[in-house]
Amino acid sequence: MSSTLVRVALFCLAALGASSALAKVETEAAEQKNIGRILIAKISEEISPGDYDALLKGLRAHPGKFARKIVLLDSIGGSTAEAMRMGRLLRETGFDSLVPSTGVCQGSCVYLLAAGLKKTVKGHVAIHRPPFPAGDSAQSSRAGMPYNVAGYLSKMGVAPSLASDMQAIEPQRMKVLTAQELARYRLN
């Protein structure tokens, strides 16, 4: 096989692998009999760099006034920075957030849930400390967090104590929040 053909094959494999790492971000407008026009964004799978752009593109594809905007969440989390960017966009554009009964919102997905003007959880929400790119030491945790999680959560109307509680849970572990905890954090 020629080296050019091998390079092309490797490039195609890398492109296929990279596309599957992105969250699935879908946006569509619908007409609801009792409410009127609604805009629905669905975010599922792993949140990765590039998902903000996919969400923005989907929102721009559906201009106009809507009676209600809802983001449906079913995500295993992923990039904290990307989730916070997406969350700010959802808040600025007036979305409510919903974790349906068949959905899960874990890890960085919590930042999308927090962004909703109105937050509804029918499924499961789980939290943990995000992994630090430079390792898991105290020094790398300070160096590896270029964002203010407590400040973000506070701006979204969520109890800032969620940030410190998330930090207490190792990245490889997960804590499923109870209905009481969701209420205490103002996530439901």
Model-derived features with residue positions:
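Extracytoplasmic/secreted envelope proteins and their assembly/folding machinery
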Residues: 40, 44, 52-59, 83-87, ...
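Bacterial N-terminal signal peptides that target proteins for export
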Residues: 1-9
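Second-shell loop/turn segments in exported
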Residues: 40-47, 72-78, 96-102, 134-140, ...
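Charged, glycine-interspersed solvent-exposed loop segments at helix/strand-loop junctions
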Residues: 133-188
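STAS-typified acidic loop motif
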Residues: 22-54
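Substrate-binding clefts and substrate-entry loops adjacent to catalytic sites
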Residues: 68-69, 93, 128-143
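Glycine-rich beta-to-alpha active-site loop
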Residues: 82, 91-133
